[in-house]
Amino acid sequence: MDADAAAAAREMPRIVGDALTASAAEAGSAWRLEPAERGLDANVIALPAGDEIRTHTGPELDVLIVVLTGSGTLETETDAIALEPGGIVWLPPRSQRRFIAGEKGLRYFSVHQRKPGLSIRSRVG
């Protein structure tokens, strides 16, 4: 296989979204990384003013978030962390977390290693 064919057969670097435009969504996942063959999961989460993501234990993965707009609080097992635009927060694997949006809502970019997906296989025998 020549170099051109090899390049055509694999994913190539490219712009996949605009965090500022995506963060304009009202609530929920405003954007997510779509290519099927990827090693990362990434999305922009939008919470309206006063909304929250209830306390839960995170996945068996490191998660990095970058606050885009608004403000809020991240509650952990031991602390409450103020979230402001530009803030970068590391969430260790299985750490407890609760996100609470401030008066102007909260929008953040989240990225982590891709979670293993479920696959449906034929039953043998």
Which role fits each region the language model picked out?
Residues 36-38, 75-79, 102:
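Short strand-coil-strand connectors
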Residues 1-40, 54-55, 121-125:
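A short, N-terminal "cap"/entry segment at the start of jelly-roll beta-barrel domains
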Residues 41-59:
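Conserved short histidine dyad/triad with adjacent acidic residue
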Residues 60-72, 77:
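Glycine- and acidic-residue-biased ligand/ion/polar-headgroup-sensing regions
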Residues 49, 60, 79, 95-96, ...:
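A generic "binding-loop/recognition-motif" signal
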Residues 2-6, 10, 98-125:
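Double-stranded beta-helix
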Residues 53-55, 74-75, 91, 97-103:
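Short beta-strand His + acidic residue motifs that chelate non-heme Fe in jelly-roll/DSBH
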